Each structure stands twice: as C-alpha cells, then as structure tokens.
Amino acid sequence: MSIDLEKLFLHEKAVNILIKIYEYEKAGKKAYPLSISRDVGSPYSYISKVLGIFERAAIIESKFEGRVKRVKLTEDGKEIAEQFLRIKNLLNRDFLARKKLRIIEAALTNGNDPNRLLPIKAELENLKTNDEEVIKRVEELKKKVGEMLNGSP
C-alpha cells in the first residue's frame, strides 16, 4: 500500500486534495467531496477516486450525513497534510533573493567604509521579493546600513 501512496503523492492534485481537507478542518468547516472538487479544480470522479485511496490507507475517514458524504482526516492524515504544507511553504521561498541576501550580509561584515556601504544599500533597495522572511531581514539590514552610514553604532 505504501508504494501506491508514494506514487499518488507525487501528483500535485492529490497533495492539494489532502491539504484542502486540512484547511477545511483548520477553519472549523466540514469537508465534502464536491466542495473539494470545486476548490481544487478537479473533476468529482477524480476526487472520489483519490479519496477512496486515502480512505483505504487510513488517511481519511468518511461518513454520510444524510445523502451527503463528509470526509475528515485521521491523525496520520493530519500529520501528512502538515508535512506537505511545510514542504509547500519551503518550496515557495524565494531562493534567489535568499542567496543575494546572504551575499549582501557577507559583504556587510567587511567594515563600514561608506564606499562599500553605499552599493550594499543600493542592493538592499533593489532586492524585491514576496518572501516574508527576506523582506523582514532586508528591512533590518537597511536600518543597520543607515546607522553605519550615519556613524551610529
């Protein structure tokens, strides 16, 4: 069974289905196959197939509420979804901006000569990203460079 799950989780849609169920539960909402289908953008038949595999693997449990099937994560399913979210967040980082930031930080440790600090300040101004961690660090470094240029410790 684990080999089937490995293959399944190499598909983006399967991961998105699992994460969508997790997000519903985190928001205090109930997860239904039809709403998952709409949110993930996959046909209901595919969602149903994947949910069947998840249920056989004890990643989700399902029960009928009237004529409507509701799904929820098991403890193992929740753990898997959290791991995938961590991986997804890691992969959404701006690695190029982080590399540039490390280079700038290394250059900044070489003293506070204004001839060296002004290009660093310019690089910090030009570093654009959506990566929140990088944005925060850039702001900290801008402040530090400004203080160094103004003669503050």
Placement of each model-derived feature along the sequence:
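Amphipathic alpha-helical dimerization/coiled-coil segments
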Residues: F84-G151
